[in-house]
Amino acid sequence: MELEVFAGQEKSELSMIEVARAILEQRGRDNEMYFSDLVNDIQTYLGKSDSAIRESLPFFYSDLNTDGSFIPLGENKWGLRSWYAIDEIDEEIITLEEDEDGAPKRKKKRVNAFMDGDEDAIDYNDDDPEDEDFTEETPSLEYDEENPDDEKSEVESYDSEINEIIPDEDLDEDVEINEEDDEEEEEEEEV
């Protein structure tokens, strides 16, 4: 495989990201690639050994994710972001997800090896809440609009309760603090 973009350049000086971009550009928009196929094409073009590719694979995958010119298309397929308009990217991903959800999968009956026909034993696997579509009905809460008269009556009742505990007359009295008593108590505690 030859890439026209790199004609006359030393292959050993090229990065895997540059080669990946060139390979995807050469293949065109409708030819997204699986990650493994992309890595194999890069290895073939650069002529690197399996061990060298394995060593640089984590860095390449990180670069592929962080480089803004690549886009994951699901199922480990990759393409160039320039191929897709922003709205089209969402549509492409959504259609892939819809294809997966098309046929519901049957759940297999779980077999418990410790329940040898014992009818009195409790099978806790049957109690899995994920197995049932359970929706708890929540009662709708209705709130009345705030009524200023209600608030006023609440404040008045609160004030009357406070006045029963401490009459307003007692609140106006000045309180005298005797500092000598405090000093004597501190001296007694130290002894």
From Swiss-Prot:
GO terms for biological process: DNA-templated transcription; regulation of DNA-templated transcription. Residues 117-191 are annotated as: Disordered. The keyword Protease does not apply. Keywords: DNA-directed RNA polymerase, Nucleotidyltransferase, Transcription, Transferase. GO terms for cellular component: DNA-directed RNA polymerase complex. One of its GO terms (molecular function) is DNA-directed RNA polymerase activity. Residues 14-83 form the HTH HARE-type domain. Gene3D superfamilies: RNA polymerase, subunit delta, N-terminal domain. Participates in both the initiation and recycling phases of transcription. In the presence of the delta subunit, RNAP displays an increased specificity of transcription, a decreased affinity for nucleic acids, and an increased efficiency of RNA synthesis because of enhanced recycling. HAMAP family: RNApol_bact_RpoE. This is Probable DNA-directed RNA polymerase subunit delta.
